[in-house]
């Protein structure tokens, strides 16, 4: 049996045990994982150093190297995520609602794990930990298929995780990692309906669309983030600058970073020179529409290709718009449904924007960078969903469950 089938079978078998594990047993497993990550910190960082060096040798751009790179702070964040998830309420077994029929038949809707989950992701090794601990806490086993860029990092992390599980009641095979980086395995994996209940792709548009279009296993589509910020004419321009800088530059390689800036034409002459200068101070390449270039002539001309593009880099495209209606129409045309923000002091415009923009997260006077499981209070996240079914936005513990009906009778028969 090849590696993929063998490990898929293992996670399916382990799920029969894990789905009935107690909250105490699951929390103990996650606590052990945190301890092992700390204990194996040196080995993980050494493995990651190899991946980072190889990426730089291949000329990978720095924003993507940043997604790949680990350091002590990021290991600490993984450990903190474990501690956070331990503290979260276990959704499994929750009675969502219940009722009693006139004949005394009792019906309850009870939250249960989804089942073995396949995760296909690219260059972020922290995903290995975040997805694992959320899966375990929600009673789901997990089959991981990371990108070749992070192979050494992921192997070191999974080794620590499996060592931790061996010291607990949770089966070691609750977490399996596919070491073979052959891309043809992705197609095989997303068709393993016999073993997997759900597949979640985390990565760029190419990966996500391939999985969505070819899978026979149900897919939870995590999103490409072509995120916009609209600066309305009533916005506090002094306060708007740090919001835009945060949204674009804090971590430009993430899906919740701002990629486009829309500016109301009535404030464009005043605001554009200020924000362009500030963006450039932070190393951002600024592209702009014709109206933007009339005000700041030395920005790079934006083309039609720019508007739908997720840069994942220190690049932003600016468009001057007539009003909130034109901003909304532009976003409707080019948005990926991830995160969209308006900066305004006008209540009516804020209400209109929130009502008409169709996205997983819509912001008023805040950075798009908050679309994140940790920031929303879910602990870690297994991805950010841009679809409307079965989950939307940051996918936390509750979104990794489904439900079943438990029906209690007294030898009832249907008339």
Swiss-Prot record:
One of its GO terms (biological process) is L-proline biosynthetic process. Pathway: Amino-acid biosynthesis; L-proline biosynthesis; L-glutamate 5-semialdehyde from L-glutamate: step 2/2. The keyword Amino-acid biosynthesis applies. PROSITE patterns: PROA (PS01223). It catalyses: L-glutamate 5-semialdehyde + phosphate + NADP(+) = L-glutamyl 5-phosphate + NADPH + H(+). Catalyzes the NADPH-dependent reduction of L-glutamate 5-phosphate into L-glutamate 5-semialdehyde and phosphate. The product spontaneously undergoes cyclization to form 1-pyrroline-5-carboxylate. This is Gamma-glutamyl phosphate reductase. The gene is proA.
């Amino acid at each position: 049996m090849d590696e993929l089938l063998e490990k898929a079978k293992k996670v399916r078998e382990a799920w029969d045990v894990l789905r009935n594990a107690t909250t105490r047993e699951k929390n103990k497993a996650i606590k052990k994982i945190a301890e092992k990550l700390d204990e194996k910190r040196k080995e993980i960082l050494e493995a990651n150093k190899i991946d980072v060096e190889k990426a730089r040798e291949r000329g990978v751009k720095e924003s993507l190297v940043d997604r790949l790179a680990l350091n002590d702070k990021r290991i600490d964040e993984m450990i903190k995520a474990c501690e956070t998830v331990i503290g979260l309420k276990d959704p499994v077994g929750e009675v969502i609602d219940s009722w009693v029929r006139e004949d005394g038949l009792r019906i309850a809707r009870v939250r249960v794990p989804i089942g073995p989950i396949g995760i296909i992701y690219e260059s972020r090794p922290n995903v290995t930990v975040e997805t694992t601990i959320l899966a375990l806490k929600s009673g789901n086993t997990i089959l991981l298929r990371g990108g070749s860029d992070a192979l050494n990092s992921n192997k070191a992390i999974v080794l620590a995780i499996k060592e931790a599980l061996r010291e607990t009641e949770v089966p070691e095979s609750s977490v399996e990692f596919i070491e073979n980086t052959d891309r043809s395995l992705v197609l095989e994996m997303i068709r393993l309906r016999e073993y997997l209940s759900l597949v979640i792709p985390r990565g760029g548009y190419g990966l996500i669309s391939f999985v969505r279009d070819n899978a026979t296993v149900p897919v939870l589509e995590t999103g490409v983030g072509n995120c916009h910020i609209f600066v309305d004419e009533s916005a506090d321009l002094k306060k708007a600058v740090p919001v835009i800088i945060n949204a674009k530059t804090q971590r430009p390689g993430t899906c919740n970073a701002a990629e486009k800036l829309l500016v109301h034409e009535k404030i464009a002459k005043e605001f554009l020179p200020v924000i362009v200068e500030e963006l450039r101070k932070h190393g951002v390449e600024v592209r702009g529409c014709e109206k933007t270039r009339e005000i700041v002539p030395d920005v790079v001309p934006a083309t039609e290709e720019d508007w739908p593009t997720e840069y994942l880099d220190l690049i932003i495209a600016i468009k001057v718009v007539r009003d909130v209606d034109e901003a909304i129409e532009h976003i409707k045309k080019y948005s990926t449904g991830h995160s969209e923000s308006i900066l305004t002091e006008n209540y009516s415009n804020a209400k209109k924007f929130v009502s008409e923009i169709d996205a997983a997260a819509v912001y008023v006077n805040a950075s798009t960078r908050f679309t994140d499981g940790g920031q929303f209070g879910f602990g870690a996240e297994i991805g950010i969903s841009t679809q409307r079914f079965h989950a939307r936005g940051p996918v936390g513990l509750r979104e990794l469950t489904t439900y079943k009906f438990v029906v209690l009778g007294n030898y009832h028969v249907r008339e």
